[in-house]
């Protein structure tokens, strides 16, 4: 919501030639980092409880607790990746944004295997592969930021609640779409968990 909305607000402000248009990029990054601290805190102290609320039994909690903890501790990377991707896409470089998404996903798939099996890191390795993938995405997006074609400038400024609200208003539709997908997936998981247990949920996740 913050990333997509701020990127749209930035594009509108740039067209209007507003002097503070570039502030939206830094502002979005700062607010994403600040809000992601809630996920980091929850991941460190309440990862097992979160898994239980989402329907995991004690066996799954024992196996996946470290995965959840590592994954949530990297929340700042995931949220900042959404911001950089949205700004690159709105700055006339959708190809780079798509490449960032594609290669970060490929990195995740390949390093899931490498870290889990050859390096024998198990679920922690899978979590690290997933957690590091947004860094790859941001690295690819930075190619655009450092190019001459980029109009996005990283202007350090104080976090602005007004700009946060202005950006978030335009990102509500994206937020609703993401939340709808999450709720549907969660509902399916609960139903399948009752019908087929953990194996059924795993099979549904693969499909």
Label each PLM-derived region with a short phrase.
Residues 62, 130, 141-181:
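Interhelical loop/hinge segments that connect adjacent transmembrane helices in multipass membrane
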Residues 51-58, 114-121, 175, 182-207:
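Helix-terminus/linker motif at the lipid-water interface of multi-pass membrane proteins
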Residues 64-68, 127, 198-206:
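Small-residue hotspots at the loop-to-helix junctions and early N-terminal turns
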Residues 38-69:
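Short membrane-interface helical motifs at transmembrane helix boundaries
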């Amino acid at each position: 919501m913050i990333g997509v909305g701020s990127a749209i607000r930035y594009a509108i402000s740039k067209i209007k030639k507003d002097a503070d248009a570039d502030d939206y990029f830094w502002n979005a990054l700062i607010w994403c980092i600040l809000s992601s601290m809630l996920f980091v805190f929850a991941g460190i102290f309440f990862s097992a409880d979160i898994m239980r609320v989402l329907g995991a039994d004690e066996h799954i909690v024992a196996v996946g607790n470290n995965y959840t903890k590592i994954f949530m501790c990297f929340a700042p990377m995931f949220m900042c990746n959404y911001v950089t991707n949205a700004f690159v896409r709105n700055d006339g470089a959708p190809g780079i944004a798509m490449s960032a998404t594609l290669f970060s996903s490929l990195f995740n798939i390949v390093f899931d295997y490498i870290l889990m099996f050859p390096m024998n890191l198990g679920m922690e390795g899978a979590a690290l592969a997933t957690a590091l993938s947004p860094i790859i995405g941001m690295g690819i997006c930075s190619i655009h930021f450092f190019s001459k074609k980029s109009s996005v400038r990283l202007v350090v400024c104080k976090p602005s609640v007004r700009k946060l609200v202005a950006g978030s208003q335009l990102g509500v539709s994206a937020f609703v779409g993401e939340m709808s997908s999450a709720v549907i997936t969660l509902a399916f998981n609960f139903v399948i968990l009752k019908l087929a247990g953990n194996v059924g949920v795993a099979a549904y996740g693969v499909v």
